[in-house]
Design a protein with these regions (language model features):
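A short glycine-rich, His/Asp/Glu-containing loop-to-beta-strand
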Residues: 38-43
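Charged, amphipathic alpha-helical segments and their flanking helix caps
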Residues: 1-33, 45-133
């Protein structure tokens, strides 16, 4: 199995433990989210690139995205509750990642709303991860 798939699956498994059956989970950034699928949690990677830090190793880094989607009418404080009570606590300790990545460093936090269909509001936390193939 591809390392990126294993990373996403490890994070999703931990989030499922923390959130239970109260959300729909996506392996990757969904192209479309139906209102019936909300709340939803998505995990995806972007900007994967070779770092070349060690001459004799295959060092890589990528951005790990974890996002929660809720109904567009909900206030940002509802997104904050999701992040603070479910998402962030789950991300503090993911034992399954220990053999897959070397480091996981918080990078940023973002809010976004669906401008086209007004279906969802999203909060996203990103981490810089480093790993060796």
């Amino acid at each position: 199995m591809n390392r990126h798939t294993k990373i996403r699956q490890a994070v999703l498994a931990r989030l499922r433990e923390e959130c239970g059956e109260c959300a729909t989970f996506f392996d990757g950034l969904p192209a479309f989210i139906d209102a019936q699928e909300l709340p939803a949690v998505a995990v995806w990677l972007s900007d994967a690139r070779y770092t070349g830090k060690m001459t004799d190793e295959d060092d890589w880094q990528a951005v790990l995205h974890i996002a929660v989607f809720i109904r567009a009418q909900a206030p940002d404080s509802e997104l904050d509750k999701w992040m603070e009570n479910s998402i962030y606590p789950a991300l503090r300790h993911i034992p399954a990642l220990s053999g897959l990545i070397d480091t996981m460093t918080p990078q940023g936090f973002n809010y976004q709303r669906d401008d086209e269909m007004a279906t969802w509001a999203m909060a996203e936390i990103t981490y810089q991860i480093a790993y060796t193939n």
